[in-house]
Amino acid sequence: MNIRVGFGYDVHKLVADRDLWLGGIKIDYELGLLGHSDADVLIHAICDALLGAANMRDIGYHFPDTAAETLNVDSKILLKKTMDLIAAKGYTLGNIDATVCAERPKLNPHVSAMKACLAEVMGVDEDQISIKAT
């Protein structure tokens, strides 16, 4: 068995007049993340980890922030495409262990919904996904 591990990291600035998307779900909060896409930092970090584990560069290479087709795109679409890319190379997902670093909003009430959303998009069981907030 060939086990590969990837690491993903993403940061976006919180700003007014944007929706806050994390883990594929919209979270009710007065600020949102600034970005070319919906700026879902959790999904972007997961994409980077998957692509890195498969030695396939990073999210910016496959889905550049200069491309019209990625403007305001739902990051769940990028995650699904990333899963398709790694599957085409013969890789399957073992598990995801992710930590979101944010003082606000409190994310623990949303973790179950994020896990369910990500599992559905990725075609895996929820018990293959761990999300922590600090």
Where are these regions (language model features)?
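Pyridoxal 5′-phosphate
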Residues: I131-K132
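RNase III-family endoribonuclease catalytic core
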Residues: N2-M114, V121-M122
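Short acidic capping loops at alpha-helix termini that bridge into adjacent secondary structure
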Residues: D125-Q128
